[in-house]
Amino acid sequence: MNPAPNLVMIGPMGAGKSSIGRRIAKHFNLHFADTDHAIVERAGTSISTIFKYSGEPEFRRLEREVLYDLLNHENRLIATGGGTILDPENRHRMQKRGFVVFLKINVNTQLERLAHDRYRPLLQQIDRKQVLSDLYATRQPLYQKIADMIVTTDHMSPNTATAQLILDLTAHWQKSSNTA
């Protein structure tokens, strides 16, 4: 099994961190946690409301608190928000307390998957493709830098991506335990 205390899913919005993460957590008998859901619970309001009335800095502060709390436990699969990796301390903490899986997706697939999403604050723009392209350019190198494993989820259903990730994780952990 995973030699790290937790399994951490990173990647852009629409990559499948939550939907695939729930399935992976169930398969490996891990407690599932979603940082965005935990932020909403802690703040008592929606992410859109936090962005609108308190701004992105306050949202990122809450995100950091929630992430630290979740990482202080073990045997969790933590699905992070797409921007969690922007904070250098978050990146350090995720690497220290988890096996980090980057669910990679291209901008066109993101657009398809998020076409009807009207709740994400960063997508409340006229040119969604440009917003996603800009986010991709900024965040992609950070995702890759801290990832222990990269899985591309383009053109994969959640079930297919889950099955592939289970195979990849199992093979990686078996290989790691054989070389330890």
From Swiss-Prot:
GO molecular function annotation: ATP binding; magnesium ion binding; shikimate kinase activity
Binding site for substrate: 36, 60, 82, 139
UniProt keywords, alphabetically: Amino-acid biosynthesis, Aromatic amino acid biosynthesis, ATP-binding, Cytoplasm, Kinase, Magnesium, Metal-binding, Nucleotide-binding, Transferase
Cofactor: how and how many bound: Binds 1 Mg(2+) ion per subunit.
Pathway: Metabolic intermediate biosynthesis; chorismate biosynthesis; chorismate from D-erythrose 4-phosphate and phosphoenolpyruvate: step 5/7
Major location category of this protein: cytoplasm
EC number: 2.7.1.71
Pfam families, sorted: SKI
GO CC, one annotated term: cytosol
Matches recorded under PROSITE patterns: SHIKIMATE_KINASE
Single biological process term from Gene Ontology: chorismate biosynthetic process
Chemical reaction(s) catalysed: shikimate + ATP = 3-phosphoshikimate + ADP + H(+)
Binding site for Mg(2+): 18
SUPFAM superfamilies the record matches: P-loop containing nucleoside triphosphate hydrolases
Keyword Transferase among UniProt keywords: yes
Subcellular localization: Cytoplasm
Stretches assigned to coiled coil: none
Similarity remark: Belongs to the shikimate kinase family.
Assembly description: Monomer.
Protein name (record): Shikimate kinase
